[in-house]
Amino acid sequence: MTTYGKLIGASLGPGDPELITRRAWAVLQSGARWLYPVKKAEESSYALSIVERGGLPIPGDAEELVFPMTRDADILAKAWQRAAVRTVALLAEGRDLVFLVEG
């Protein structure tokens, strides 16, 4: 039987790294693998930049998930499906994941 890791959401506040909660800061340093959103593959992530400006090093295994900025339902559905499949695959490895989100 597979033992899944936990998926943890880390809200990073409105963009000022000084406003990241203590709990989110602790989760970011817990050893959980980081997932972060981008609009396009290999593009910068606003959520990731908040953490960087806060002074935390970005783990080498941090991974982007692409969430395109479009109203095309087919494109969105495919992107969300890819992100979900990847997230479940990583959780199935048994390691906790933290998903970085602004707001």
Language-model regions, residue ranges each:
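Class I S-adenosyl-L-methionine
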Residues: 1-17, 22-103
